[in-house]
Amino acid sequence: MKKLAIAIGAPALILSGAAQADTVVGLYAGAQVWDTSNSGQFGTGNGNQSFAFTDEKQTSFYIAVEHPIPFLPNIKIRENELVSYGATTLTQDFNFNAQVYSANSSITSYVDLSHTDFTLYYELFDNDLIAFDLGMKGKKVDGWLAIREGINENGIRSDGWIPTGYAHLRLGIPGTYLTFYGIANAISVDDSSVHDFEVGAEYRLVDSIALDLNLQIGYRDIKIELDDLDGVYSDLKFKGPYLGLEVHF
């Protein structure tokens, strides 16, 4: 992976001595369906091409483990689907992955930037009114970007790790089962930048000793701006509302 290095996340290590640990081991599992509006452009270093991308329903699944061991970070693993199809009629020649597509040609595109997030974090605050987590995340991308003209497909694979900082804030409303939250993951290095932001509300449907069940309604915004990641250049945006369920044992 070129030009990307960890720029955020050191605060989590610095503050780890003050981090709070769970009194018992907690297991979280969740699933979300995300309605994305997609836009942007991509290329392979000879100029990016914009496409009219389709809106898609994406899915996301995660598990997290929190524990009482001091100084050892908690862990969260999240699988993210990130796929879209596009189409355009070229107004000028477009060189993609060593193949030239002529002006006035009608081409389609396929973007798959699905990835797995691995997050290590500390709980700096953890109570019913306010909870704040800080740490670092690695996005393991298994990407495929392709141009199609007729039955011919020309694609390039882009695999690697994108490190980002991680922050998660939760604010509980006293006397209710309602919680508001925000999650931020971001990095900017040279001409590349990635952000993944979420805001939402969570309502507790089940509150028992055995488990908690939460309904989530939120909005997520991902932007992936790459400058020569395995030869890929991009400025792609995926954003929209989502609905989810989370269970806490």
Spans of model-derived segments:
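Residues on the lipid-exposed face of transmembrane beta-strands in outer-membrane beta-barrel proteins
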Residues: A31, F61-H67, F118-Y122, M136-G138, ...
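Outer-membrane beta-barrel translocator/channel fold
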Residues: A210-F249
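Residues that define the transmembrane beta-barrel architecture of outer-membrane proteins
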Residues: T23-V25, D55-F61, D112-T116, I130, ...
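Flexible, solvent-exposed loop segments that connect beta-strands
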Residues: S37-A52, Y85-V111, V141-S158, D190, ...
